[in-house]
Design a protein with these regions (language model features):
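Predominantly late transmembrane helices and immediately cytosolic-facing juxtamembrane segments
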Residues: 2-22, 26-28, 62-82, 87-91, ...
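Central hydrophobic cores of alpha-helical transmembrane segments
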Residues: 149-151, 340-349, 367-369
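Alpha-helical transmembrane segments of multi-pass membrane transporters
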Residues: 154-162, 346-357
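Short, charged juxtamembrane terminal tails flanking transmembrane helices
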Residues: 385-392
Length: 392
């Protein structure tokens, strides 16, 4: 089975409340507790890039995020099917939470020598096994029996990575990530059900989590600086940029995605969910994390040029977020939002030269201005479409 990208017409998208497809519940407090560990995981993965602001550090951070996000997403699918009012499922989710917590503890030191890469792999194996067994007796049992063996194989590869030299470990992680993300092409995604309301809300919270972590990290980094102007102006520019990223997803995209996913036939919905909230979302989350590190670097070099990869992280992360958001929209609506792609190209074209030849502050201001411009552009387009629809 090949998971072809679905296309659903965008016209007549409902604009009301996020639909609760299939009787899905809202996100429960235990899931929010689980998400606290994901906050920690994102912080730790960002630390890898902060401490190693070079192509190798970026590759390692991206691979660790890809591996982590695969199973975080898997747990979102799991809780979509679990009855968390029962003690057994609660304990299984808490056991998975413990596995994620140990993984997160190990992340920064897993890239170097010592036992931490083995600890990361062992915890990951626990997370995968808990995920498999927790699905038993749920609506996704048939689906996990198809995909579970591939998850187990990739987890064993992650564990094996801990026994190779740090220089070669990145290649083993790459193999594990590749195995995971091509799994749907091998096993298919049949056998799962997607309750739309809970599923969309769950993933929206992940975006909030990563955006919140980025604001916290930027604020903490700026607070260690002595220059008042740098701290205040830099922090506010970074906050405005993060707010624009929030706006671009939550102003309309989340609600529209729920309506579009609801309209996909139930048997095709897992594929649509995989393409939009799986593949596209990975790069969306990665874009926010990279942009957050780039904001920190830009504030650190607020009055001076910033060369090398650190000078590209801010525009690269923002452009990646916009491109991923465009791909997310394409996976569900069937068309490419050109305004986002144009702005992504503009951010790269303006942001990198500004960082390298002017200053971090200039680049941060330019990037924030471009994002604000995109927000205004999209808002004006939506108002125009609404007026045309009303007059028709």
């Amino acid at each position: 089975m090949t998971p072809d990208s679905p296309a659903v017409p965008q016209d007549d998208v409902p604009q009301g409340d996020v639909p609760q497809g299939g009787g899905a519940e809202s996100v429960r407090s235990l899931e929010l507790f689980f998400d606290l560990v994901f906050v920690f995981a994102i912080t730790q993965i960002a630390t890898v890039l902060v401490e190693h602001p070079n192509p190798g550090g970026l590759a390692r951070a991206a691979l660790l995020l890809a591996i982590t996000w695969w199973m975080y997403g898997g747990y979102a699918w799991l809780t979509n099917a679990l009855d968390l009012d029962r003690t057994g499922p609660r304990l299984m989710l808490l056991l998975g939470t413990a596995g994620f917590f140990v993984m997160s503890q190990a992340v920064p030191r897993a890239v170097g020598p010592g036992p931490w890469a083995v600890v990361f792999g062992a915890a990951y194996l626990v997370v995968v096994l808990v995920h498999f067994f927790a699905f038993q007796g749920t609506s996704g049992q048939r689906g996990i029996h198809r995909i579970g063996p591939y998850n187990l194989a990739s987890a064993l590869v992650v564990l094996a990575a801990g026994f190779v030299a740090p220089e070669q470990r990145v290649w083993v992680w790459a193999l594990a990530g590749l195995m995971e993300w091509v799994t749907p092409w091998l096993s298919g995604v049949g056998g799962f059900t997607v309750g739309v309301g809970h599923f969309v809300e769950r993933h929206g919270l992940a975006v909030i989590i990563v955006l919140g972590e980025s604001v916290t990290e930027v604020g903490a980094a700026a607070s260690h600086l002595d220059d008042l102007t740098t701290v205040l102006v830099g922090s506010l520019l970074a906050l405005a940029a993060s707010a624009a990223l929030w706006w671009l997803y939550f102003d309309r995209e989340e609600e529209a995605s729920a309506a579009l996913l609801e309209r996909v036939p139930a048997e095709e919905r897992p594929r649509a969910a995989l393409w939009s909230f799986g593949y596209a979302y990975l790069f969306l989350i990665l874009g926010i994390a990279v942009a957050a590190v780039g904001m920190q670097k830009a504030i650190d070099s607020f009055r001076h040029p910033l060369h090398g990869l650190p000078g590209a992280l801010l525009p690269l992360g923002v452009a990646l977020y916009l491109a991923a958001l465009a791909a997310f929209h394409r996976a569900l609506a069937g068309d490419w939002p050109r305004r986002r792609l144009v702005t992504a190209a503009a951010v790269l074209a303006a942001g990198v030269p500004a960082l390298r030849w002017s200053s971090g502050g200039t680049a941060l201001a330019v990037t924030t201005a471009l994002l604000a411009g995109l927000v205004c552009w999209e808002s004006a387009a939506q108002r125009g479409a609404a007026l045309r629809s009303r007059d028709a």
